[in-house]
Amino acid sequence: MSPVISHPRPAAARHQFDELSPITITVDCPAKTNLTLEVGPAHDEWGGRHELDTIYCAIGVYDTVTATAKQPGAGFSLELEGAYLGDLASSRSDMRRNHAVLALFAMAQAAEREPDVALTITKRIPVGAGLGGGSADAAATMLAVNRLWELNWPIERLRTIAATLGADMPFCLTGGLAYGTGFGERITDIAPGSRDELALIEQGFSGEVLVGAYQSQLSTPEVYHTFDLVGAAEGDRNHLQAAAISLHPRSGQAIDAATQAGASHAFVSGSGPSVVAFAADEAAAQRIIDVWRDTAVVDRIIRAKSPAHPNIGVRQ
């Protein structure tokens, strides 16, 4: 499913758009989790990245990227907002390494134009949490610039560019549910109402979605390095889970607490440390929330829906 576009510009006005237009594009892009994550061997041709076989699921926790054209030659700017910026708020953070900025540069190079765009990111997705917040920001930037510059490139072309930036960025362009292979960048969408989606629902991947988040962060390379040492635990749908828990034991405690409270599924999200729990109904969701609060095994609880999709808005 393609991103939802709201408030489209009248067709008659499109030819008037140029770099000086005051039009602003806003994209809300959801977090991602991995319902399954099988990790294979590392490949030198992929820069040492591991082979992955995963089922992506976008969940309704959104970062918002706002893009406005600047004067020609003015260059780009980046502003970060939100209460959960993590390391992004550090004065040592290089904005040119921000995922959204890298996505802007990649789009500018592909379009053969200068990246004269003002970006504002409102963060709600926890940082360094295994929820794809940086990938969501990159995907949102690509969708915004595609609209702002009136490129009208199809999703497949955007995914080709996104694959040069990160494993799950191609998925974040559309959200929903999808299979990911290669190093995670090869996307096969799972259509709403399809047999594959119904199978996931029957397995318990439906209802309320709860995210247990932490102030602490995990480095994805460190988690993969630990995985190379300890491997996957038997029965784990996420092969990185044992490695993440060894580095962040509270994640394991949160999984145990959610499971005992009646979660249909509870697991480390991606490389962690966040924990995602699916609850069949409101009562089960409330039990999980209560036990997480009572035992303090998570620092922040986010309630969300899934599957979710990006939303694109246009304002004058």
Curated annotation (Swiss-Prot):
Top class in the EC scheme: transferase
Domain of life assignment: Bacteria
Keyword ATP-binding on entry: yes
Binding site for ATP: 126-136
Keywords assigned by UniProt, alphabetized: ATP-binding, Isoprene biosynthesis, Kinase, Nucleotide-binding, Transferase
InterPro entries from the UniProt entry: GHMP_kinase_C_dom (IPR013750), GHMP_kinase_C_sf (IPR036554), GHMP_kinase_N_dom (IPR006204), IspE (IPR004424), Ribosomal_Su5_D2-typ_SF (IPR020568), Ribsml_uS5_D2-typ_fold_subgr (IPR014721)
Any GO MF annotation of the entry: ATP binding
GO biological process: isopentenyl diphosphate biosynthetic process, methylerythritol 4-phosphate pathway; terpenoid biosynthetic process
Pathway field: Isoprenoid biosynthesis; isopentenyl diphosphate biosynthesis via DXP pathway; isopentenyl diphosphate from 1-deoxy-D-xylulose 5-phosphate: step 3/6
Pfam families: GHMP_kinases_C (PF08544), GHMP_kinases_N (PF00288)
Active site: 32, 168
Entry's EC annotation: 2.7.1.148
Catalytic activity: 4-CDP-2-C-methyl-D-erythritol + ATP = 4-CDP-2-C-methyl-D-erythritol 2-phosphate + ADP + H(+)
Family to which the UniProt record says this protein belongs: Belongs to the GHMP kinase family. IspE subfamily.
Function per UniProt: Catalyzes the phosphorylation of the position 2 hydroxy group of 4-diphosphocytidyl-2C-methyl-D-erythritol.
Protein name: 4-diphosphocytidyl-2-C-methyl-D-erythritol kinase
Lineage of origin: Bacteria, Bacillati, Actinomycetota, Actinomycetes, Bifidobacteriales
